[in-house]
Amino acid sequence: MGKNKNYNKNQFKKSKTNNDTTVAQQQQTIEEKPDFKIDGSILEGGGQILRNSVALASLFNKAISIEKIRYNRDQPGLKNQHKAGIDLMSRLFKAHLTGCSVGSCKLYYQPTQKTIQDDGVIEADTKTAGSICLMIQVSLPCLIFAPHSTKMVLGGGTNCDFAPAADYIQNVFLPIATTMGFKCEMSIDKRGFYPKGGGAVTLTTQPLTQPLSPITIVNKGEVNRIVIKSYFTSPRISPLVAERMNNTAKKLIKKDFKKVDVETELIDVSKFSFGDGTFIEIRAYTDQGCIFGATGNGAIGVPAEKVAEDAANSLLKDLQDGGCMDEYLQDQLIIFMALAKGKSQIKTGPISLHTQTSIHITSLMTGAIFTITPLTNNTQSGEETNLITCEGISYFPSDLNNNNNNSNSNTTTTTTTTTISTTTIDNQNSEEK
């Protein structure tokens, strides 16, 4: 066992003053005094900093300023898909928002209401092939704590590079995350491929009756089922392309999992897509309830075999690393672990830069204490395994408490107030775009 690393502190500094005064929405003049000033260039240095900080600022009704947004990217500043997510949150929480324009490297966000109002169906659209799932990531932590059910219809890209696929959220993330006690259903109504976008996803949630339960995923077990699905749009794209993807992925996976049943399926989504495209989804299930996922998007000039190889190799690496989840799931669970009541533990492979970033932002804004414990290496690939432990803050907003009291609930819950402290961390840059 290695030495524990505590992440209950952060280099970010709580802001005391900010003399900038701007004209707010609806012609109101608001003095911008952020509770937190966040350096958007640290660690992963990308959109995840925006999504986590805006989500938590909304939950805790705190004002934030973010500077150096995506500062080390080839094209710094906000992209349209980031702007769409922040605009969505601004509408949900009637926020005072400045600097939220494409290319902006600085923004200020201050929610003016403490919860999402029941105003009917929530609609948002990236207007491009920008990722729908990035809008889900920023909004879901808040939607599940709304005092009423919610329905959200989102437009944009469903299968995008540098973002989770809608299939991954639906088939990997949600089945695992909802074991913490929240109810969320998702449907992919229309596929939106790059570069046209035009996809549609519907997300519904039900109000919680108690804080999130902690999550424990420490026993991987044995892989007992693998599913490979390749999607295509006919007649522009032949089913033979999707079949080549399936065959390539299955051949690679069977080398390591000879005795495991590998299911394959070809799916024509031409009637449910805007534009043409191909996509491969691979999932591995274990006898202990773990789910691993990998995806790949077809592209002009890229052989179908290459798309399948990359997805299959990504899945195989995660399975060989010895953790109980793939590298993409680990960072997406962090914010929910922090908000839960009690101690959560997840066993992972190497700690990704996205996970480090999520831990730092979440620790800063919630006060939740994270510990990363390196575990004895027992994997085929020689990679490290780690145990991420979090003492959650038992977050439960007062309006949900009131709802429960009004319905004579026997559940007793409280909202925990936390104290935030700061420390210094190494500044690292990510090559991700």
From Swiss-Prot:
InterPro entries: RNA3'-term_phos_cycl_insert, RNA3'_phos_cyclase_dom, RNA3'_phos_cyclase_dom_sf, RNA3'_term_phos_cyc, RNA3'_term_phos_cyc_type_1, RNA3'_term_phos_cycl-like_CS, RNA3'P_cycl/enolpyr_Trfase_a/b, RPTC_insert. It is found in: Nucleus, Nucleoplasm. GO terms for cellular component: nucleoplasm; nucleus. Residues 1-10, 401-425 have a biased composition (Low complexity). The active site is at 354 (tele-amp-histidine intermediate). Its EC number is 6.5.1.4. Keywords: ATP-binding, Ligase, Nucleotide-binding, Nucleus. Residues 18-28 have a biased composition (Polar residues). It comes from the Eukaryota. Residues 1-28, 400-433 are annotated as: Disordered. The keyword Transport does not apply. GO terms for biological process: RNA processing. The keyword ATP-binding applies. Signal peptide: none annotated. GO terms for molecular function: ATP binding; RNA-3'-phosphate cyclase activity. Catalyzes the conversion of 3'-phosphate to a 2',3'-cyclic phosphodiester at the end of RNA. The mechanism of action of the enzyme occurs in 3 steps: (A) adenylation of the enzyme by ATP; (B) transfer of adenylate to an RNA-N3'P to produce RNA-N3'PP5'A; (C) and attack of the adjacent 2'-hydroxyl on the 3'-phosphorus in the diester linkage to produce the cyclic end product. The biological role of this enzyme is unknown but it is likely to function in some aspects of cellular RNA processing. This is Probable RNA 3'-terminal phosphate cyclase. It comes from Dictyostelium discoideum. The gene is rtca.
